[in-house]
């Protein structure tokens, strides 16, 4: 006998207040309890129709769209859809979409773990850097551009913002930036498909002393403000090749002689204060707070609105994985990448294989058989991004606002390639 089937209509519901609305062609998936999947796409009203046998289903949808210079990612899941012989097909299953917004500029690489010293006496960690990349097709010009990190510095430390297992700011539309922020006193412009290197510690050639380290004397930008952060281990005088106009300036509202980005498990983010200058924003005590540590400046943070945040990455230490907790909210980063520090390893973004292979002119320029992954972590695309870039290819990196999916541990800092 031919088994009976039923019409299931799924309606995608866009967030209230979003500048986006329903469009035709968004992929929607129905997954049965046995693992069987059914695929359909939406019509212009955001509806997708399925014909399925009786069963229990989960509907899911994911959409990525660009608008007004920003990238939008929308995700939604509806579980427990029970289709039985009483199902008439008149009911519409609504899947509420959550929206996250990211800018054109992404964090391509975050190197914080340090390396082993040549004499075997331990590790060296004052060579941190970040590479920002314009993942879009248009030049990006960012005003009032800033760098931030979340307290506590290590993911396995006590997080005072957790209440009954939930971040106290989970639904408050901000991320707390600890200690202080770094900001560029002028606009940051990155051409499409290009990158900038920012030395977060020591804009010098570290390899002259530690051969396993990196050369940051040729960085494009650096963090250097000796009045606020005076510890010379972190901030030696930058290389003369870096113009002083490319120094990031600090605004410190916490305490300390250095902006101590964790060498094990940082939560790092980039943002723009838009029409407010960084100094005015960071000095506004209405944004300041100390989670359960009132009056203690060591714990003072400032609340960065989530819609100001362009990109972020959360890192967990491999050695402290079981004790680590999220500090970034799901709308900013729904996952984490894992790092074994002190080995010269780096957190490197995965390639969007489909998008990269679809770029006109990339044929014959992409280098495959990627072999820089380590400790069971690698780029699933199989594309060697650095080798491909040197070969003239245009790389599109994966950006789903989930570091578990978007990053891997690379066994060598890309600046050493």
Give the role of each language-model region:
Residues 1-18, 95-97:
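Bacterial Sec-dependent N-terminal signal peptides
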Residues 16-34, 140-144:
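Short, ordered, surface-exposed loop/turn motifs in non-cytosolic proteins
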Residues 34-47:
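Short, acidic Ser/Thr/Gly-rich low-complexity loop/linker segments typical of extracellular
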Residues 48-50, 91-93, 196:
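Short strand-edge motifs at loop-to-beta-strand transitions and within beta-strands
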Residues 49-58:
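Short Pro-Gly-centered beta-turn/loop motif in secreted/extracellular proteins
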Residues 65-96:
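Structured interaction patches on ligand/partner-binding surfaces of diverse proteins
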Residues 97-156, 243, 252-266, 271-295:
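A structural motif detector for short, solvent-exposed N-terminal "entry" segments of globular domains
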Residues 169-405:
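Solvent-exposed beta-edge/loop recognition patches
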